[in-house]
Amino acid sequence: MMPNSRSATITPTTESTTTTTTTTTTLTTSYWCYSCTRFISVWEDQDANAGVLCPYCNGGFIEEIEDSSNSTVAAIPASTPEVRSVEETHRSIIRRRRSNRRTSFNPVIVLHGGGGGGAGERVENEEGDGATRERRAYEFYYDDGSGSGLRPLPDSVSEILMGSGFERLLEQLSQIEASGNGIGRSGNPPASKSAIESLPRVEISDCHTKAEANCAVCTEVFEAGIEGREMPCKHIFHGDCIVPWLSIRNSCPVCRFELPSDPIQRSNEEEHAVGMTIWRLPGGGFAVGRFNAGVREGERILPVVLTEMDGGGLGSNEGPRRISWVRAHETPEMSRNGGRSGNGGRLRRAVRGMVSFMRRVRPSRGSSNSNVIDLDSDGETRVMNRSTSLIRRFF
């Protein structure tokens, strides 16, 4: 149960036969820091009679996490190929994170459980002691960065996370999956190549600028005399803006007029989502990455990002505005060029256009700490704060 006072201090269990002050140097089990909203590992190199402090915020508002063997959460079924894929992807993420600067937060791994809703059926524990547990729609795991691997998340911490907006986020992601779009896919399919190429090229004149002064994708003012592309709905855009946009979704950014799209064919294996990784961003909101059983070698799923200001926990009745990316295919040519290929260039242009448009439509909270997306030259995605980097190369 979460303490009801932020000044509360949870001290570790220590053994002492005398009243003499002693000093210990041992690595403790995991702790949950309520102030940082993250898991921590603490070196007890201090007065044994003093409380353990979080190394990030230097606060004592922490709770020791019980050993996973005592948890009622089911252990990861390591025999399945899907879970082996999740663990290998997770280890790769951890290796990349450790090679970069020390981050101030860590992810929660969410796997699809056997339950179909909020309250699952009762099943017998694996220990064979006759006790039962509730099979949940989602199973939560975490890694505290100590090298011990994934552990089941204790029920008490799961309840805290669900109460902080995770439950609503998971419901939204489930609705996206059920609608057939999938996590990381846009609501509209990409426009067909022939439809994009058939868009007429027009020279922007004063007549055009009187009707539309700005490109709706990048929001920049049109300059008379430059070339633009005209949609069938008669809306005008920069060619470098509307082509990447239509390569992601087939609708007009202004009126939602839809261009023809190619039939989408996906195998059942490719559609099977095993689980996801959720980052609680310090500035508010979440970043979500999906583990997929059908991911081919050299292929990555770039994350969908939902922010609290867009329906991630502020009580808005609107659906979440989300930035959705397609699969990133890494070819031998991209590997040799460090990820700089023609496809990579087009993806980066699409990112710039999407970010510019999302900046325009995203409601403001009166703060300069809104989140934007940045695509590194090597094709990796980061969620950025306008003043501080929040996520460092997590895929």
Swiss-Prot record:
This is E3 ubiquitin-protein ligase RDUF1. It catalyses: S-ubiquitinyl-[E2 ubiquitin-conjugating enzyme]-L-cysteine + [acceptor protein]-L-lysine = [E2 ubiquitin-conjugating enzyme]-L-cysteine + N(6)-ubiquitinyl-[acceptor protein]-L-lysine. Residues 121-130 have a biased composition (Basic and acidic residues). It is an enzyme of class 2 (transferase). Its main location: cytoplasm. E3 ubiquitin-protein ligase involved in the positive regulation of abscisic acid-dependent drought stress responses. Involved in the positive regulation of responses to salt and osmotic stresses during seed germination and early seedling development. Possesses E3 ubiquitin ligase activity in vitro. Expressed in root tips, leaf tips, junction of carpels and pedicels, stigma, anthers, pollen, vasculature of sepals and petals, immature seeds and embryos. It holds the Pfam family zf-RING_2. GO terms for biological process: abscisic acid-activated signaling pathway; protein autoubiquitination; response to abscisic acid; response to water deprivation. Plants over-expressing RDUF1 display decreased sensitivity to salt and osmotic stresses. SUPFAM superfamilies: RING/U-box. Disruption phenotype: No visible phenotype under normal growth conditions. Mutant plants have decreased sensitivity to abscisic acid (ABA) and reduced tolerance to drought stress. A zinc finger (RING-type) spans 215-256. Keywords: Abscisic acid signaling pathway, Cytoplasm, Metal-binding, Nucleus, Stress response, Transferase, Ubl conjugation pathway, Zinc, Zinc-finger. GO terms for molecular function: ubiquitin protein ligase activity; ubiquitin-protein transferase activity; zinc ion binding. Its EC number is 2.3.2.27. It comes from Arabidopsis thaliana (Mouse-ear cress). Pathway: Protein modification; protein ubiquitination. GO terms for cellular component: cytoplasm; cytosol; nucleus. Induction: Induced by abscisic acid (ABA), and drought and salt stresses. Residues 9-22 have a biased composition (Low complexity). Changing residue 255 to S: Loss of E3 ubiquitin ligase activity. Gene3D superfamilies: Zinc/RING finger domain, C3HC4 (zinc finger). It is found in: Cytoplasm, Cytosol; Nucleus. Residues 1-22, 107-130 are annotated as: Disordered.
